[in-house]
Regions:
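Phosphate-coordination loops involved in phosphoryl transfer and adenosine-cofactor binding
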Residues: 16, 63-67, 138, 147
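Active-site regions of enzymes building and remodeling cell-envelope glycoconjugates
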Residues: 1-3, 14-19, 102-110, 195-200
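Short, polar loop motifs at secondary-structure junctions
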Residues: 2-8, 92-99
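Rossmann-like adenosine-cofactor binding region
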Residues: 96-191
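Adenosine-phosphate binding glycine-rich loop
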Residues: 37, 186-187, 195-203
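Phosphate/diphosphate ligand-binding glycine-rich loop within oxidoreductases
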Residues: 1-49
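Residues at the starts of beta-strands that form the adenosine-phosphate
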Residues: 66, 88-89
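Glycine-rich NAD(P)-binding loop of Rossmann-like domains
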Residues: 47-78, 105
Length: 203
């Protein structure tokens, strides 16, 4: 099944079917996509591609950037490897504080807000649980840097969508690149589609 989560199948779970998990199968391609989204957003590539005339310089480098990754599973491990040539300072937020190769700092989820402060780019790469629904809302977005991008390759429910729209419309953060949304699929009339600092790709 080409999507994450079993919520849609809960009504038909029974002992007549064998359910298996493809955990880790998509870690590397998802991490690659996350990196592509970060570069596209931070370097203002999407904006340049839509421009009919050139203006002043825009965008920032990923080289040497402060990176925060929320989640400590296979996608994070693959993403950390992909970030190695960029010499980023990497902080990982996860449930259990255990060292990860290539990561400068690992903190618990209770330190999420501190890990958002000063980050140039924030990646969401964690599973959706009752504790992580609405993990990123207005209080978290307000502490982020005005140039920071948030990249969500996890689940749409991690971000409070209305709060994200507010943050993007008011330039509270630099932008958002979303491989997942809440709701999903996103209605054609949703404001996220038309925001110049929002990139959306099909999960």
């Amino acid at each position: 099944v080409p999507f994450a989560g079993i919520e849609n199948f809960v009504p038909i779970l029974d002992d007549d079917r064998t359910w298996t998990c493809g955990k880790g199968v998509y870690a590397e391609p998802v991490a690659e996509h996350a990196l592509a989204l970060a570069l596209t957003g931070m370097r203002h590539i999407a904006g340049y591609s839509r421009a009919s005339k050139w203006t002043g310089p825009a965008g920032r480098n990923l080289l040497g950037a402060a990176v925060t990754i929320v989640g400590g599973g296979g996608i994070t491990e693959s993403l950390v490897r992909l970030l190695t040539p960029f010499h980023c300072s990497i902080t990982v937020v996860r449930r259990t504080v255990e060292n990860i190769d290539g990561v400068d700092t690992v903190v618990g989820q209770e330190n999420l807000v501190d890990a958002l402060v000063g980050a140039d780019v924030v990646f969401l790469a964690l599973s959706l649980t009752p504790e992580t629904v609405g993990l990123i809302g207005k209080p978290e977005l307000e502490v982020m840097e005005p140039h920071a991008w948030i990249i969500n390759v996890a689940r749409g429910g991690h971000i409070v969508t209305d709060d994200l729209v507010w943050a993007l419309e008011n330039n509270v953060i630099g932008g958002a690149a979303l491989d997942v949304t809440d709701p999903e699929p996103l209605p054609e009339s949703h404001p996220l589609w038309s925001l110049p600092n929002c990139i959306i790709t099909p999960h």
